[in-house]
Amino acid sequence: MKFAILFGGNSYEHEISIVSAVALKKVINQNLEFIFCDEERRFYHIPSEKMNSKTFSTKAYKKEKELFIQQGGFFSKGFLKENKLECECVINLIHGGDGEDGKIAALFEFYSIKFIGPRLEASVLSFNKELTKLYAKSVGVKTLDYTMLRKGQNSKEKLRFPCIIKPARLGSSIGISIVKDEKDLEYAKDVGFEFDNDLVVEEFKNNIKEYNLAGCVINDKFVFSIIEEPKKKEFLDFEQKYLSFSGHNELIEANLSEELKEKLKDSFKKIYNPLFKGALIRCDFFILDNEVYLNEINPNPGSLANYLFKDFSTTLNTLADQIPLEKMIKINYNFLHSINGQKGKL
């Protein structure tokens, strides 16, 4: 399978997406194409040998061939004709906005481009933490109780401390604050509202444990990664979450009973099916008093969570093989033909 990796985007996680693409290049041992989306949403074809941080930090990528998107794929302008970028499947590796909020999914679906990643509806529901909680509840998966704070509105609801405040529409740990008492609340709100107009507030639980599970559906069967127990801090910050996929953090496989492992997998299945078909996702769960709670859905996890799989390359290739393209509607204009000769025709 010939893959193209799409990365970058107009996102707070733009640089992390670059790191993720470089990391994935080292993991997938096959011929790859690299498509960089800059902050102005222009696409560039990056040669494999130039996939390094300097290419992007110095804006040297602007010297590379610019691509444009149209029906069936990415193209560049040639002397006499347009040249199509040869790839069989695009991996959506844009983290945060653009890649996870539905923009790229809509673009690919519109132009009939085969891709690994969440589709439009899945993107919308997983990118907004409030909608994620509502979706989880609808499929029978628990989440922690929460309160919403809206910019410009005075909430009359009494908050319990300590609490954790998160921007509703950010794909990572950006803008998150742990508030231990009321005197720190206004500052935390100001930080959160810098990134989003809606904030999710949850009671902070000291005795809670976090577990990560990635997977996908291939040929109607679930393929799961190992279950990871992240190193424990108050919460994983931006740098911690994304250095793990580059091999800088020690992977800790969770020491759980078979009963709890099955509970996690069952919750994952409820979240995934059928909404996330065609995507390899990671779900971050909490376990509290032997009950499983969904924390968040990562529809485009860092380097697609390769570090959690025993045979990541086979999983990725097999997933790509079975992704169908949306069937196009055939327009025959029969109705317009039928009224074409009538009096008072359109």
UniProtKB/Swiss-Prot annotation:
It is an enzyme of class 6 (ligase). It comes from the Bacteria. It catalyses: 2 D-alanine + ATP = D-alanyl-D-alanine + ADP + phosphate + H(+). This is D-alanine--D-alanine ligase. Pathway: Cell wall biogenesis; peptidoglycan biosynthesis. It is found in: Cytoplasm. ATP binds at residues 159-211. InterPro entries: ATP-grasp, ATP_grasp_subdomain_1, D-Ala_lig_Van_CS, D_ala_D_ala, Dala_Dala_lig_C, Dala_Dala_lig_N, PreATP-grasp_dom_sf. The keyword NAD does not apply. One of its GO terms (biological process) is cell wall organization. Keywords: ATP-binding, Cell shape, Cell wall biogenesis/degradation, Cytoplasm, Ligase, Magnesium, Manganese, Metal-binding, Nucleotide-binding, Peptidoglycan synthesis. Its cofactor is Mg(2+); Mn(2+). GO terms for molecular function: ATP binding; D-alanine-D-alanine ligase activity; metal ion binding. Belongs to the D-alanine--D-alanine ligase family. Binds 2 magnesium or manganese ions per subunit. GO terms for cellular component: cytoplasm. Cell wall formation.
